[in-house]
Amino acid sequence: MKMEMHQIWSRIALASFAFAILFVSVSADDVVVLTEENFEKEVGHDKGALVEFYAPWCGHCKKLAPEYEKLPNSFKKAKSVLIAKVDCDEHKSVCSKYGVSGYPTIQWFPKGSLEPKKFEGPRTAESLAEFVNTEGGTNVKIATAPSHVVVLTPETFNEVVLDGTKDVLVEFYAPWCGHCKSLAPIYEKVAAVFKSEDDVVIANLDADKYRDLAEKYDVSGFPTLKFFPKGNKAGEDYGGGRDLDDFVAFINEKSGTSRDAKGQLTSEAGIVEDLDELVKEFVAANDEEKKAVFARIEEEVKKLEGSASRYGKIYLKVSKKYLEKGSDYAKNEIQRLERLLEKSISPAKADELTLKKNILSTYA
């Protein structure tokens, strides 16, 4: 059983790695936000511009969002193209000027021109990219994000979901279900947020294809979300909101993780409450008393399990350095780590440095 489970997780890890190599990740960070103040500064000059005119409350705009968000990363190397958007609730005069009467409206502004051409095709990333390629003379293909959602089957369900070392969120979906399609891009982001957490799994099961398994877990509508924590493999219904922030807050609370919606560790990550109280005593004590408090920290760390045990070892290292180098050590080390975090480093390295920085802050 252990060998089978090891093989399954190995296959999942290899598949994720392969996807990461083959495809460029998707990000919405490079969509240029246009306003009444900057529209004509950004558009109509040395770049062709694809502009989405939208309203925050518009359902069709929300449906378009995950498709539109694929464009900026794909066109990142096409220096002659700008991917942008305008909030027509906030900047009505801009939208009125360019004849926008419904949402979303997507227009192409050629280089050196403020005379747009309206996009009339299907609202998919592929169709939008083809439109930009035709109008802008580029040859770009859509970058596809690697998926961190674990796809379940009857053969893998028990090994993955009932693994007592994992907290597992499962979406039971049907391919034809509209609400499932709307949830899909959000669910992908949830999986990406927690991809570095070894004991958290975000998974899904085609409940239309595997009806017997879905019925076993009382699935009667789609999507149905169930959480299988380490301590309750019977499963619990997820009844929270379906925005990214809702899912992230839920997993953080249930699994003891500390991630934000971008997948980065928060300032609370690594903090062990019982050790924090001892650190306060340690910092306030004189040199002789510090040694006695350090011995108590060592004893407390021995009691810790799981990720808390790993954090406890960082507390011990910091305490030793504090004894050797004095009270300025924590402040100086925090500044050094902050400089490193500003550089281009891997997510795993960023996690490592952030954990240490958070723990150091309790000594500063």
From Swiss-Prot:
InterPro entries: ERp29_C, ERp29_C_sf, PDI, PDI_thioredoxin-like_dom, Thioredoxin-like_sf, Thioredoxin_CS, Thioredoxin_domain. Residues 1-28 form the signal peptide. One of its GO terms (molecular function) is protein disulfide isomerase activity. Gene3D superfamilies: Endoplasmic reticulum resident protein 29, C-terminal domain, Glutaredoxin. Keywords: Disulfide bond, Endoplasmic reticulum, Isomerase, Redox-active center, Repeat, Signal. Its main location: endoplasmic reticulum. The active site is at residues 58, 61, 177, 180. SUPFAM superfamilies: ERP29 C domain-like, Thioredoxin-like. Residues 29-137, 139-256 form the Thioredoxin domain. Pfam families: ERp29, Thioredoxin. Belongs to the protein disulfide isomerase family. This is Probable protein disulfide-isomerase A6. It comes from Medicago sativa.
